[in-house]
Amino acid sequence: MGGHSHWATVKRHKGAMDVKRGKIFTRIIREVTIAARSGADPDGNPRLRLAILKAKEANMPGDTLKKAIQRGTGELPGVLYEEFHLEAYGPGGIGVLMEITSDNRNRTVAELRNLLTKNHGNMAEAGAVSWQFHKKGLLTIEKGKVDEDTLLSIALDAGAEDVKVGEKLFEVLTDPHHFEAVKKALADAKIETALAEVTFVPQNTVKLEEKAAEQMLKLMEVLDEHDDVQKLHANFDISDEVMEDRKSVV
């Protein structure tokens, strides 16, 4: 996956687990509800605007989306979710950053600590891992979809910070404030993105070999299955060869 690999990219290699589990709606509903606390008008609420876009891309029914917004604004009763980050270490000292939405912080922390302990990981103190990540807009494009010079010109003109060339993908990195402008510029140029999100990108990555890679992927899958984990980030890199070997047995 060239340079650094993102958990979201690894998940696509594995067959979009979220979709199969039906978790994607749950996550988007929580994101919409929380975003709507800052106002129901997407024009004045960038976070809600992005959440609504995700909901539409996932073909969420309009009524479901409307109710999620109304729960956020207080028009409808709903669960009060708290947002927070948890930090952990995986096999080989890999840093893991978890974005959480929970209606019971103590329960969530206890459950995730238990999952970590059972899967070659452990909880870290606040700040121990987060410094290893930068918040960035990330857009990936399959290399066959566009030539490098065209992508560079469009992305950088729209405000992108960098374009990285991987083995199979281009990765466009932006400041979070310029993410929407870059995404729109690519869409206007009919350049299809495989992934487009504001995420936490590792400053550096640690390459994992077969056993540690297998343990790390298993840990990430287990954490990802927890209902309160909205997003996962980790600073590991796994070669395409290891991923291909794993796909053949998954």
Regions found by a protein language model. Give the residues of each.
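Short acidic, Gly/Pro-enriched loop/turn segments at secondary-structure junctions
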Residues: 237-246
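Cytosolic regulatory modules rich in charged/polar residues
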Residues: 175, 196, 203-238
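Glycine- and Gly-Pro-enriched alpha-helical subdomains that act as flexible
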Residues: 107-181, 189
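N-terminal cationic and glycine-rich segments that engage phosphates or anionic surfaces
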Residues: 1-124, 129-138
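Conserved small/polar residues in nucleotide/adenosyl-binding loops
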Residues: 249-250
